Amino acid sequence: MQVIDRLYKDYRPLYPIEEFCPVGQALFIDIETTGLKKETTSLYLIGCGHYTDEGFATKLFFAETGAEEALILSAFDSFACSFTHLFHFNGNKFDIPYLLYKAGLYDMDGFLKDTVQIDIYRLCKPLRYLLFPETMRQKAIEEFLGIGREDKYTGGELIEVYQEYEKRPTDQAFCDLITHNREDVLGMHKIMPILYYLSFKDAPLSYVGYHTNRYSDYTGIEHEEVIFEYRTDISFPRSFTAKTETMYVKASCDDGKILIRLPIHDQEMKIYFDNYRDYCYLPEEDTAILKTLAYSLPKGRYQKATRDTAYQRVSGTFLKQPHSLFKPVLCTDRKDKKKYFRFPEDFNKEAAEEFGRSLINIFFCMKRTSST
């Protein structure tokens, strides 16, 4: 077994760790194994990182062979017991269950007892569709934040490297193995600022204004869109763009400017009346009017309105809205869950900030198949 220590001088927390625990009680951990199935694979490396008065210290417990698995587990347990909170990336799903299973095989009672698990991946998960629509691997977050690596391998690729190392140890293989693990541990320290983006949910926004824009798509068809401008006081490390099928958001970390681009729909909509019993439907005109007005017409001209026929048609230009914020609420059909409002007639500045928040919040409640 080898224990490899390194100090990154003057490294300080990049996010307020105190939100979770005292800084000195936080231990970042990452493990390397010969496979995903804990019952048939072995643990060969446990990496740790923690803050000291001098900086960020890493400590790696490396098993020269599979026979040293119990040794690195025991050494890690003795070291980790000084910390109350373990930080990891998707560790609730893999690292922690794996470690506990292996500790159980060696009758290590009290292994990681009373430690609090802080899964950075779980904390970041609400940002999935705002920032990481393709993948939310740790390396993807590092790339987004502009964090570079010396390591050129994945954990899966290093399995073969370790298996070859067990037979014929080389300095290069050893360096590749520990570099990958150390950079995973160090990377967790570096990606903590990603948590600042969680503040975008229900974020306070200042409405600046809007302007419209016309453009032609690749087929030559002309479209019109509206671009809303907001400002935010939220601090975040990198500018970003996010989009759904019909919305585009651009946020600048330099000045807090947020632009939200929405398509303008030029089509016929319908406004449905909840109090449909107070209306009559006129089939020839395809519209509903109040009973008091209908009764002045010949009986053959009207019929009792139903939920499906108590509507009036509206022509004009419209914007989609996540909630029934701007009235009247319009739709293409009663069963259509999408809501619209007349734009610019029914848009009001007093509700503009709430409108902007509701649009950004869409990214925090999206599901894999959702579209907006």
Description of each model-found segment:
Residues 46-48:
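Short beta-strand scaffold segments in enzyme catalytic cores
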Residues 1-29, 34-41, 51-372:
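DEDD superfamily 3′-5′ metal-dependent exonuclease/proofreading module
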